[in-house]
UniProtKB/Swiss-Prot annotation:
One of its GO terms (molecular function) is 1,4-alpha-oligoglucan phosphorylase activity. Homodimer. It catalyses: thymidine + phosphate = 2-deoxy-alpha-D-ribose 1-phosphate + thymine. Pathway: Pyrimidine metabolism; dTMP biosynthesis via salvage pathway; dTMP from thymine: step 1/2. InterPro entries: Glycosyl_Trfase_fam3, Glycosyl_Trfase_fam3_N_dom, Glycosyl_Trfase_fam3_N_dom_sf, Nuc_phospho_transferase, PYNP-like_C_sf, PYNP_C, Pyrmidine_PPas_bac/euk, Pyrmidine_PPase_CS. Keywords: Glycosyltransferase, Transferase. This is Thymidine phosphorylase. GO terms for biological process: pyrimidine nucleobase metabolic process; thymidine metabolic process. It comes from Mesorhizobium japonicum (strain LMG 29417 / CECT 9101 / MAFF 303099) (Mesorhizobium loti (strain MAFF 303099)). GO terms for cellular component: cytosol. Belongs to the thymidine/pyrimidine-nucleoside phosphorylase family. Its EC number is 2.4.2.4. The enzymes which catalyze the reversible phosphorolysis of pyrimidine nucleosides are involved in the degradation of these compounds and in their utilization as carbon and energy sources, or in the rescue of pyrimidine bases for nucleotide synthesis.
Length: 439
């Protein structure tokens, strides 16, 4: 069928068959479908949506547009996590080694940051020598030898998604739930997983600010993943403040090393990381209950086995062998430090989390366009959480910048992002809801 006929069919509100969807995505991959046709298709889906069967067919067609990894030779279950993104979200750096040290295999294919949210791959790139985009042979070696590897999407995995996403990004169709769902899941299915846990963020630092939108996305992801044959569950977690007390690249890696080694563990970050670890372990069958998973993940973290696994992963993928012992020796440090100070007494009652992320972007630590270069050394540390008591002159955060002018600009954004009130607010739940496939 001609691409324009498939577009017209969806434009007029009709359901597309699996064959129509496969033919269109085949054209996206081969180049037979033009950018204009792909954009028109995305807009038709944006306005008319897709039902579960259509979204499953789209996901599978995008998965099959490239290679699908096979981990059947591994002597254990294969699992992964996907986060919809936020600020100070360095969970993957602790989660992958925790779950791997418990006996699962975690081939984690991650993305780069765009907009106000940070990207896991950019964080790993802050480690000197670390090969974040290895060939398949080195990727497999790292997973086999250490139990986990955090890498970027290769050219051979879900190439249709890469092209379609670039078109969506410039045509106002990024927010379409079926297209988001297929984009996320096609890459995860191409990674050859046996199970997947989704961390769907909600709040003023997330892409989904409203609970109903986050729930709709979580339900779509869970139902489509299940329809595609993947064991799946989702947690909806809060993003009304940064998850870690650091936001940036090198600073979040340092925060992750401190977490793994026990030097510093931010409470909300620990809650989310261990909840996701328990969920992943239960999904693999390595534990019989969520409680058992939580206990085992906590034990693996506190014993140092997770830190040792992270250290081995970094070394196998080209990073320093002593990185976990001496992160400050290797991580870039910005030349200017600037304390952001409270102007009044009280309690931190709210944080405009998106603005914290945008302050990092303004420092050079994020992207406004996909081809922007990142400075790994800049960022913000010692971010006070909601509920902290402050006095006028106390530090709310510490900005790390390339110049005093950059530091002052970021500090102005950060200080205006903090709301200070007379009463201590009630603590928000960090993990809000668990979503499973229906039936």
């Amino acid at each position: 069928m001609l691409p324009q006929e498939i577009i017209r069919h969806k434009r007029d509100g009709h359901r597309l068959s699996a064959g129509e969807i496969a033919a269109f995505i085949g054209g996206v991959t081969s180049g037979a479908v033009t950018d204009g046709q792909a954009a028109a298709f995305a807009m038709a889906v944006f306005f008319n949506g897709m039902n579960r069967d259509e979204a499953v067919a789209l996901t599978l067609a995008m998965r099959d547009s490239g290679d699908v990894l096979d981990w059947s030779d591994l002597p254990g279950p294969v699992t992964d996590k996907h986060s919809t993104g936020g600020v100070g979200d360095n969970v993957s750096l602790m989660l992958a080694p925790i779950v791997a040290a418990c006996g699962a295999y975690v081939p984690m294919i991650s993305g780069r940051g765009l907009g106000h949210t940070g990207g896991t791959l950019d964080k790993m790139d802050a480690i000197p020598g670390y090969i974040s985009q290895p060939d398949i042979a080195l990727f497999r070696q790292a997973v086999l030898e250490t139990g986990c590897a955090i890498i970027g999407q290769t050219a051979d995995l879900a190439p249709a998604d890469r092209r379609l996403y670039a078109i969506r990004d410039v045509t106002g169709t990024v927010e379409s739930v079926p297209l988001i769902t297929a984009s996320i899941l096609s890459k995860k299915l191409a990674a050859g997983l046996g199970s997947l846990v989704l961390d769907v963020k909600v709040g003023n630092g997330a892409f989904m600010e409203r609970s109903r939108d986050a729930t709709a996305l979580a339900n779509s992801l869970v139902e489509v993943a299940s329809g595609a044959g993947l064991k799946v569950s989702a947690l909806i977690t809060g993003m009304n403040e940064p998850l870690a007390s650091a936001a940036g690249n090198a600073v979040e890696v340092h925060n992750a090393v401190d977490f793994l080694t026990g030097r510093l563990r931010d409470r909300r970050l620990e809650d989310v990381t261990l909840a996701l670890a328990a969920e992943m372990l239960q999904s693999t069958g390595l534990v019989s209950s969520n409680q058992d998973g939580l206990r085992r993940a906590t034990e693996t973290l506190t014993s140092g086995r997770a830190a040792a696994t992270f250290a081995r992963m970094v070394a196998v993928l080209g990073g320093p062998a002593d990185f976990i012992e001496k992160p400050e020796k290797y991580l870039a440090v910005a030349p200017t430090e600037f304390a952001v100070r409270a102007t009044t007494d009280g309690f931190v009652t709210g944080i405009a989390t998106r603005d914290i992320g945008l302050a990092v972007v303004g420092l050079g630590g994020g992207r406004t366009r996909p081809d922007d270069k990142i400075d790994p050394s800049v960022g913000i540390t010692r971010l006070l959480p909601i509920g902290a008591e402050v006095h006028a002159g106390d530090a709310l955060a510490l900005v790390h910048a390339r110049s005093p002018a950059d530091a002052e600009a970021a500090a102005a954004t950060v200080v205006s992002a903090y709301a200070i009130g007379a009463s201590k607010p009630a603590a928000d739940k960090t993990v809000m809801r668990r979503i499973l496939p229906r039936g």
